[in-house]
Amino acid sequence: MKTLKIFILHFLALSCFSVNAASIDGQVTFKQDKINQKVDVFIDNKYFTTYLYSNDLEKQVLFPIFTVSGKDITRGFPLAPRPFERTDHPHHIGLWFNFGDVNGLDFWNNSLAIKPENKHKYGSIKFIKIKNINASKGKLQTLAAWIDNDGKKLLEENTTFIFSENNGLRSIERITQLTSKQKEVIFTENKEGLIGLRVDRAFEEPSQKAERYLDSNGNMTETPVLNNEGVNGVYRNAEGVTGSDVWGKKSKWVALHADKNGEIITIVMFDNEKNPNYPAWSHARGYGLFAMNNLAGKAVDKDSPSVKITLKKGEKITFRHKIVIGGDLSDSQIENMANNFNRRKK
């Protein structure tokens, strides 16, 4: 299986193309491996993440993602399953961007698990090329296409990733511009979107019911069990809402806090005031999905205005989001980050 091969080779020594330079926040290094269709990202010679662009994945993802201290914040399943993980939602891989209703097609839920007879209901994001690597600015620029199951291109996607590290904080900015390639491309409100992160077990909320997980040998348990060992994630948003109640609420930022193996880690997801329908609706779930959706509308909040965006051929729409990974971050620290993100010129 091609995607499994990509992961197995992930930690091997790379004899591949690399670019590095001193950035404002540290030395960013990109190592591109064209054979295995990936770009590894390092800061100060310490691993950060990998951009995976195999078209077997139905979309491009950043996976896995590590803290400064070397702890993985992403779920391993389905590419690299770990003991005691959940195996739900195989389309949740690392950090990604897509949506649940584009001209009636579901891009969000597509994965290798979808049966061939149902594939016509789903869309895929196909990689085209790496446009540019600029290590001095921590930038990776990519080109992709949103297509239907027959290969018809609905949207052209130009994405810029900006990777940085400062004072123990790692960040990923994603700026995605979508251009219509059809007479009309319609985004209809849907809860499944828009930028998503599937987190490690430590960041989940403790479960109240027995469930099936992978055992120590990587096999699914025969009998449901209640296992909350090491599980202690807590969400909070800019308005002070906590826990599972953040879901469906509009907020300019949502933070997820947990203790993983004795280290306090906070993951923060930021919306940008230039985005449509700012601030975005939270699509954060206790089982480990951490997402922010600018196009959710009534799909998550019946009192919200309806959301429907139509792009004529050649028209564009741009989304800007940021992920910050740090220690025990206070609300005031996060507010300052949000303000800086909104002030930054793109």
What residue spans do the PLM features occupy?
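Positively charged n-region of N-terminal signal peptides that target proteins for export
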Residues: 1-6
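Bacterial N-terminal signal peptides
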Residues: 7-18
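Beta-strand-rich N-terminal accessory domains
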Residues: 22-90, 175, 330, 335
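Acidic (Asp/Glu-rich), glycine- and aromatic
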Residues: 51-57, 61-64, 166-214, 225
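Extended, loop-rich substrate-binding clefts of extracytoplasmic carbohydrate-active enzymes
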Residues: 93-168
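Beta-strand elements of well-folded, non-transmembrane domains
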Residues: 144-148, 161-165, 178-182, 199-203, ...
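Active-site/ligand-binding surface loops and adjacent short beta/alpha elements
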Residues: 191-276
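Beta-strand-rich recognition/accessory modules
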Residues: 267-346
